[in-house]
Design a protein with these regions (language model features):
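Sec-dependent N-terminal signal peptides
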Residues: 4-13
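Sec/Tat signal peptide C-region and signal peptidase I cleavage site
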Residues: 15-19
């Protein structure tokens, strides 16, 4: 959405505003403040939308910054939208755009982490209270007080509440559905970083396989690009249209195909043929097992997870391991024993991986989940594994699809990467309408429009476990993904605490 924003800071008691209902509404908004919530005495007035900041302090160490955008009463559509953050928070995502386009009251939060991920704050130890804020509390309280502010400003409750977010924001959406099912009627969680313990295993394994014991990188960016491209070429004669030769139709590959594309990579770049390097590469894609239990499936073939030579993966997001690098109190995980300790200590807090969505389902909640088949940061096998386990609990994909649907987007990478088809959140305002229609009109989304700009093509991605492809005439068809290939994490490595 194109953003045009002219902002004026307005103080209480200052110059009068042109918004007719602002003064009375803001006086009511100020009354929302209590021992936890402090509403700012100043606002940002952009065109005819008011941006109100409020701070939440549920415990002494907490400092949760929030912002809500309030359209004028005559333009409010009656909806409340929560907006997710990215990475480890610390900044306020924009809320003006969505309010301006659809007319919703729109709120977000910095997750209470701003002082700990910037500058000197990164050297501080993070109190447990702030970890709770980041994991679940900031989003929940932002929602509670955001709705109260909307009601105070407009004189009535929102008729529906929705949430959308990607990566960290996708995790926030999962946490809301699992921990606070009454907060939202509909949630769109894209590329969710919701399985911190599993992502930690993937990234710890990735680091160990691509670095020596002194932390020196063993692969160049060019070598890893060859490895990322090899599966596309290896599968081009078996993949259907329109994917063949461009992206993988299905990156959940069996061991024989992993061996095949690694052999092709070594042929393309003979420097990769070293037996130790080939062993390390295979370990990246085959995942990790300990004591007979699977920790993670492995990284996705076709996804590019390159880095500058000599630089580690310390800045990668989405895992327990990297949170300590960002001073969120976890510390550098150096061994698999350390990893096990971290899982036991904080895994249940940081994960949003429960398969108990009874309360969310029973009150009519709807959850749309997106994952990307080239996601290099929150690898999608964990999301697919969770959805398969969820479907087993609720009697199959059909019954589960009555309240939760997963759409796997071919060629889609995480923000910060470069997907062969698309990169980032994977949604637009039009995509948000799919969620609203499901909640308000009971029209479940039978497909998710996935835009392939370079081919001027829109892929009608069906709900998992179906994939779509084109026949020789260019007509879209569907078939099921192969079963039994995904290496699911053992449930013991996916702990979940409802409220920690």
């Amino acid at each position: 959405m194109k953003r045009i924003l002219t902002a004026v800071i307005v103080l209480l008691g200052g110059a009068p505003l042109c918004a007719g209902d602002f003064k009375a509404g803001f006086a009511a908004v100020k009354s929302v403040g209590d021992s936890v919530c402090t509403v700012s005495n100043s606002v940002i007035f952009s065109n005819d939308i008011v941006l109100v900041d409020f701070t939440l302090k549920p415990e002494a160490e907490c400092d949760i910054r929030c912002r809500i955008a309030l359209p004028p009463t005559k333009k409010w559509n009656g909806e409340f939208w929560g907006i997710g953050n990215n990475s480890f928070g610390g900044v306020l995502p924009p809320v003006y755009d969505l309010s301006a386009v659809i007319g919703s009251a729109t709120a977000t939060t910095d997750l209470g982490t701003s002082r700990y991920i910037k500058g000197e704050g990164r050297k501080q130890d993070v109190p447990p209270a702030v970890l709770r804020d980041y994991a679940w509390r900031a989003t929940h309280l932002m929602t509670i007080y955001g709705k109260r502010i909307a009601k105070a400003f407009y004189g009535r409750d929102p008729h529906h509440a929705y949430f959308r977010g990607g990566s960290c924001g996708g995790r926030q959406g999962f946490s809301e559905a699992m921990r606070f099912p009454a907060d939202y009627d509909g949630i769109l969680s894209s590329i969710p970083a919701a399985f911190s313990t599993v992502s930690s295993a993937q990234f710890l394994n990735l680091y160990k396989q691509t670095h020596d014991e002194e932390g020196r990188a063993l692969f160049t960016r060019e070598q890893l690009r060859v490895v990322a491209d090899a599966p596309i070429e290896c599968m081009k004669d078996r993949d259907p249209k329109p994917y063949a030769g461009y992206v993988l139709a299905n990156p959940i590959l069996p061991e024989r195909d992993i061996d095949g594309f690694l052999a092709l990579a070594a042929k393309k770049d003979p420097s990769l043929a070293d037996p130790d390097l080939m062993r390390r590469l295979k370990n990246i894609f085959m995942g990790v097992s300990r004591n007979g239990k699977t920790l993670c499936h492995g990284m996705l073939p076709g996804a590019y997870f390159g880095f500058k030579r000599g630089r580690s993966f310390e800045d990668k997001g989405g895992s327990l391991m990297t949170l300590r690098y960002r001073r969120l109190g976890f510390g550098k995980v150096a061994s698999w024993d350390d990893y096990e300790d971290e899982v036991a200590r904080v895994g249940g807090l940081m994960n949003a991986c429960s398969t108990d969505l009874d309360a969310f389902r029973d009150r009519g909640g709807k959850l749309i989940v997106l994952c990307g088949w080239e996601d290099q940061t929150t690898p999608s096998p964990e999301t697919v594994a969770w959805y398969e386990m969820l479907s087993e609990k609720y009697g199959g994909f059909g019954k589960t699809g009555e309240f939760c649907r997963l759409f796997a987007l071919p060629g889609h990478a995480h923000g910060g990467g470069k997907g062969r088809i698309s990169t980032g959140g994977g949604y637009t305002v039009d995509h948000l309408d799919l969620l609203r229609k499901w909640v308000e009109e009971k029209k479940a989304p039978d497909s998710y429009p996935h835009r392939w700009k370079e081919k001027d093509l829109t892929i009608p991605v069906p709900p998992y476990p179906l994939m779509c492809y084109q026949d020789d005439a260019g007509n879209w068809k569907t078939k099921r993904y192969p079963e039994g290939v995904l290496r699911r994490p053992d449930p013991s490595y996916m702990p979940f605490d409802p409220v920690h």
